[in-house]
Structures are given as structure tokens and as C-alpha cells.
Amino acid sequence: LAFGVKARVVERAVLRGASLEIPPGSLVVLAGENGAGKTTLLRLLLGEAPDAGEVAVPPGRRVAYIPGEREVDLGEAPILEAVYRRLKDVGAAIEVLNRVGLSDAVLYRARPHELSTGQRERFRLALLLAERPDLLLIDEFAAHLDVPTARRVALGLGKLCREAGVTLVAATHRPEVVAALDPDLLVYVGYGGLTTVPRRGPRT
């Protein structure tokens, strides 16, 4: 996907002439302070119209989005049942839960409100990954997790996305999350523009 845009929030230009190309299957981290424009950038990728320029996401791509501060209704069904409803395959549902670190058989029967904050964060990921997205957008990834948990979740998510060929764009201001994700591209968002830093060589 690729774009070149200008976007405003309440008459203040958040992004000016921003240009970025993201190869399919890449892991990209948007870094920057709160209010720098990371959420605006994700919303543009999600389909919000820019004030100028264009955002080009290949047609037919499945896009999944985890918002930042807003709580998402995770339902009342046991977590294994909830993932199974999306995949229609018990084995595949168990595999997805295992990959995000929810591998305890007791947890399979737990309902979302019975989970810890970190477990709910991982369950949200499991639900979206069960939709088999081509592009996964996450705002303020792992914002409410302690450092060790944030690292574990980031490591697991990065590995899962690489294995499944999912393009990931995650916004964060936490350096330990950036290090754990080990992205292909680090994009600093601020001062109305973007600064890109490649971090990985070609994949083998």
C-alpha cells in the first residue's frame, strides 16, 4: 500500500505532504509522542479521506483495526468459542489462542471479563487474527501492559504476522515494544511529517 496525504484535525495540520510505501507482509511501527499524528495515519489507512492526496490500499484486502483508548466489546462467550465462531475449526481456533499466549486449557473456557488486562489484549489480537486479515492496524499497541508482558505480546505478534504474511502497522511510543517487534520499517511521526528508518534487510 502507498499514500501521499495532508490531514487536518481541528484546523491544525497533523500531517503535511506525508508519503510512505509499505510492501505487503511488512511489519511497520509508527513511533512518536502522543498527538503527533499516529492515530490520524492509521485512520487514513483504514479508509478515512485525507484533506489532500490519496491513500492506495490494494482492492480486496481484508483490514482489521484495534483502536487505542476506546474499549472494545469482547462479548460474553468463552474465548475458545468466540474464536471458533470466526474460524469454524476447533484446531485452528486453539492454534490462534496458543500463538497469542493463551494456551492454558482452563483459559479456553474463560469469558472475556474474567481475563486479566494482558489476557484481554491478547484475546483481542486472537479475534482479529481469526478473521485472517491482510492488513492489521493497531493503535497504541500494548499501552496498558507492564514492560515484561508488553515484550512477550509484541514478540508473539511479530512472529505470528511474519509467519502468516500479515502486513502489520502498529503505533506505539514505547521503545521496548519497538525493540520486541523488530519491524522492517520504523516511521517517526511528528512535526507534520514522517521520517522512515529501514531496520531489516531483505527477507529470505
Which positions does each model-derived feature cover?
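ABC-family P-loop ATPase nucleotide-binding domains
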Residues: 3-9, 66-123, 127, 131, ...
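Conserved structural motif at the start of ABC-family nucleotide-binding domains
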Residues: 14-17
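Conserved hydrophobic segment flanking the Walker A/P-loop of ABC-type ATPase nucleotide-binding domains
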Residues: 21-22
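Walker B catalytic motif
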Residues: 137-141, 145-148
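Helical segment within the ABC ATPase nucleotide-binding domain
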Residues: 150-163
